[in-house]
UniProtKB/Swiss-Prot annotation:
This is Small ribosomal subunit protein uS8. PANTHER family: 40S RIBOSOMAL PROTEIN S15A. It comes from Neisseria gonorrhoeae (strain ATCC 700825 / FA 1090). Keywords: Ribonucleoprotein, Ribosomal protein, RNA-binding, rRNA-binding. The keyword Membrane does not apply. One of its GO terms (biological process) is translation. One of its GO terms (cellular component) is ribonucleoprotein complex. Belongs to the universal ribosomal protein uS8 family.
Length: 130
């Protein structure tokens, strides 16, 4: 079976693993998935991530919990293959009045909404995390 939207698959695996109180989740790796995982780690939503360098590289994400509850309360895909969403730096929305983040793919790499606004770059709005 071919996968049409690997980013949605990644977000769904994270959401399902946290609902099942799993310590870690594994998935096929790509450069974009690693960049998203790096942003999630920098913002404190996951413990860590690692990429195995076998024949098919696997991305393993160590999930984070606080007081027995998942740190990620909501993780949602915004731009999808059937309907891409692009925003200028001034149009990038604030998630939960700054308590959550939007992950944006820009010409300067994958970054949070705050970083994109401060650097004055827009791009594709990949997902929101709260």
């Amino acid at each position: 079976m071919s996968m049409h939207d690997p980013i949605s698959d990644m977000l769904t695996r994270i959401r399902n693993a946290q609902r099942a109180n799993k310590a870690a989740v594994a998935m096929p790796s790509s450069k974009l998935k690693c960049a998203i995982a790096k942003v999630l780690k920098e913002e404190g939503y996951i413990e860590d991530f690692a990429v195995s360098s076998d024949v098919k590289s696997i991305l393993e994400i160590q999930l984070k919990y606080y007081a027995g509850r998942p740190v990620i309360e909501q993780i949602k895909r915004v731009s999808r293959p059937g309907l891409r969403i692009y925003k200028a730096s001034s149009e990038i929305p604030s998630v939960m009045n700054g308590l959550g983040i939007a992950i944006v793919s820009t010409s300067k790499g994958v970054m949070t909404d705050r970083k994109a606004r401060s650097q004055g770059v827009g791009g594709e709005l990949l997902c929101i995390v709260a």
